[in-house]
Amino acid sequence: MKVLFINLDKGEYKISDIDSQGIISLGLKIHNEYESWKKDIYDPSVPFIFGLGPFVGGKLFGVHRMVAIFKSPLTRTLHFSSIGGVGYKFMGSGIDVIVIIGYSKEPSVIFISPDNVKIESINYVNSYKNYKGVYAFSRYLLEKYNDFFLNYNARAVVVGEGSVYTYNGNLFSFDIFNREFRMGSEDFSGRGGAGSSLFKGHNILGIVSGGNYKYRYEKANDFQLINKIFLEKFGKGYIDVINEKTKKYKYDPETKSGGTFGENYILYKELLPLFGYKSIYYPKELRRKHYENIIELFWKPFQEEVFIKSKSWFTCGDLCNVACKKVYKGKKVDYEPFHSLGPFIGNYIFEEALKLVDLVDQYGMDVIEVGYVISWLFDLVENKLLGPGEIGLNEYPIFNFENFDPKNDSYKNSKIAEKIIEGLIKKNNEILSLISEKGIRVSSKILNEKYKERIKDNKFNDYVVYASFGNEGYITPNLYWSPGMVAPMYILGKYWTDYSNSFARPEIFARSSYGRAINESLIEDLGICRFYRGVYEPVLDKLYKEITGKDLDKNLYKEIAEYSIKANAEPVLWESKRAMDLVSTMCRELNSNDWKFEKYEDYVEWWKEFKESLDKYLGLKN
């Protein structure tokens, strides 16, 4: 792999050829060489790494994701966050991996082409023409450096105010065609705080890259070879396999919908997590009533506009025929961001969620994490651990699952949520400022001490779901009612686990989660979109061997776990009652006899047996 090392302290760069299986494998190697496990998350000597996989530039679809490898402000260990389609333009520079160390004297943007690497001092622009936030900054860069974008067919990846002011900033990128943003082809590397790591650790606001280099391996451009591999495995050609395995994300004739938003509401029904996961405590009949309101007020407006009227489907900018980006009146719609600021916070009006998602997107923050912060604060106010005025509000949210008016209360909750979002950026309130800086886990412990006289049965941390790592690390799970989302896995906040609505004894659940973690880590290591996992996982060994001439090394997840152990950020026992109850209520929901959760020790035993089983499968010494 061709690796660009940029030293911001010295204003120098060098290019090295380093043999590596994929981007995460290389990133892990470099982080170990720099011993980043023992350094602060924002230490400038901790590398920020951004790169693509080996399959780019040829005839393979869905292989142009770029992956950020960084020490996460949330988990306090390495995290990996990918962004769709960016590699299709970035590969043109001839660089496979960008490694950034040091701290720029002024806020800057890095420009990379086959001819040069430039570091330009640029102040952030949060309002430009008719654009706001990351959209404004992206537009500003496109116009100011128009010649660079045109000459090198370049694309920009930028951070926003969420990276400047909070722990929860992400990376944003909009594909460009004919000097304009390509509708729907926007994406974020959302989870884990990649943007905050890039800006606070290195004072970098963005990276712009392009050129005309294509495939790295000739066989990646050999369609006959690719097609033969799929014919041998599936008995059908490559394109036919793609159409079959990705129909959920494009269009499913059975449901007459598609994409994660269109499909998940139909699939999960009363198993959807609502009201910050409070829904898990209520009977199926009540959850079903909520679900019916969500379908009517939240899902149908999207379905009618995107699948009946306009059929506005796009790609992220990758070479891809799935067109998973479903666009509602110019805004890309996916399940998790819209659910996070929709039903998860007690907002069942689709247009209201759209406004909130767009606001958080403009600020360049991870929408899922923001949804957790809002639902947590709503619950704390509902349970009188905080007063509205203490978080900058002048009215109470409606967060009672049994007594909720889907229309009127949704508008009210949406209005209040907007104030909280603004407060997280402006830090015009002591508690919101604390959360913006420290995140949920550390903040909850500070609030436990500050308001200890208010605590009766439940502490501040009991009203929010998160998984803990080491002393301060944590991550809020993706929005599925699944024990695997909070089980003691080394990487969470993504799909490196068994996230099905199921339950099993810990050693069995650990095995299925381990299997998913191995496969998901390899898919991401190679820069492949996980929407293609059903396409590539069955042929991954063969495909990698044929194209690169090398065998696929499956020890990556073990090496990641070993790094986390060195960083003192391995999984630790649940601190949140609601996280514990996410596991036990799924057991109850399925009428499972595999485990009894009657006392605290039962939860501890399930967690410990899971962790011991996982470590055994990984070959780690306890």
Regions found by a protein language model. Give the residues of each.
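Short coil/turn connectors at secondary-structure junctions
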Residues: 1, 44-47, 94-96, 105-107, ...
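N-terminal basic/disordered segments at the start of proteins
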Residues: 1-36, 91-92
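Extended C-terminal regions of large enzymes
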Residues: 6-8, 13, 23-24, 63, ...
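Conserved short S/T/G-enriched processing/targeting/catalytic segments and their helical context
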Residues: 22-77, 101, 341, 358-361, ...
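Acidic/Gly/His-enriched mid-domain segments of enzyme catalytic cores or analogous surface patches
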Residues: 40-74, 88, 102, 106-174
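Alpha-helical support elements that line or immediately flank enzyme active sites
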Residues: 76-98, 182, 186, 196, ...
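Glycine-rich phosphate/pyrophosphate-binding loops
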Residues: 83-117, 195, 200-215, 368, ...
